[in-house]
Regions:
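Acidic, PIN/NYN-like endoribonuclease modules and their adjacent C-terminal/linker elements
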Residues: 1-2, 106, 110-138
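Short, well-structured N-terminal submotif of metal-dependent ribonuclease cores
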Residues: 1-35, 47-64, 138
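Generic structural signal for small/hydrophobic residues in well-ordered secondary structure
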Residues: 6-7, 22, 43, 84, ...
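Alpha-helix capping/helix-boundary segments
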Residues: 9-10, 39, 80, 105, ...
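Residues that scaffold the ATP/ADP-binding catalytic core of kinase and kinase-like folds
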Residues: 12-13, 43-46, 84-87, 127, ...
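Residues at secondary-structure transition points
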Residues: 17-20, 34, 38, 53, ...
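Short, structured coil segments at secondary-structure junctions
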Residues: 29, 69, 127-128
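Active-site neighborhoods of divalent-metal-dependent phosphate/nucleic-acid chemistry enzymes
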Residues: 45-48, 71-119
Length: 138
């Protein structure tokens, strides 16, 4: 099985007190883990909200993360755009909207047949995306 890591999961190793269960899970499965350019954008924004030494350290972490995940960062391309349109239509017609960034991540995951690893299970389950919560692992 392969996973698309959401920002709440991927950021755990960079946090002062990251969730040890999630960090162990990432380490155990890192070769089967992907992320998206949308998640990288979310993380880059998060880094920019920090100041001083913390910002410098997080920028270094993000640069190293992008390098380590080279070839496993999936973009929002034309194929994903068509999947996204289908997801958005489904969500709109059922009256269950999803945050736009999460809907892009969901479309990328569906396009590549990946399970989204996130603590935000509720939003990703609505459009029927395969979801795994590493925060709930024991």
């Amino acid at each position: 099985m392969s996973w698309l890591l959401d920002s709440d999961v991927l950021s755990q190793p960079a946090k002062k007190i990251g969730d040890a269960r999630v960090i162990r899970w990432i380490e155990k499965h890192q070769q089967q883990c992907y992320t998206s350019s949308i998640v990288i954008a979310q993380l880059a924004f998060w880094v920019r909200t920090k100041r001083g030494k913390q910002r410098v350290a997080l920028q270094k972490w993000l640069t190293e993360l992008v390098e380590a995940m080279r070839g496993r960062i999936l973009g929002f391309n034309v194929s994903a755009a068509h999947v996204w349109a289908d997801l958005q239509y489904q969500l709109q017609t059922t009256g269950k909207p999803m945050p736009v960034e999460d809907s892009y991540i969901a479309a990328i995951a569906r396009r590549h047949n990946l399970t989204v690893a996130t603590g935000n299970v509720k939003d990703f389950q609505r459009p029927g995306i395969k979801v795994f919560d590493p925060f709930a692992e024991t």
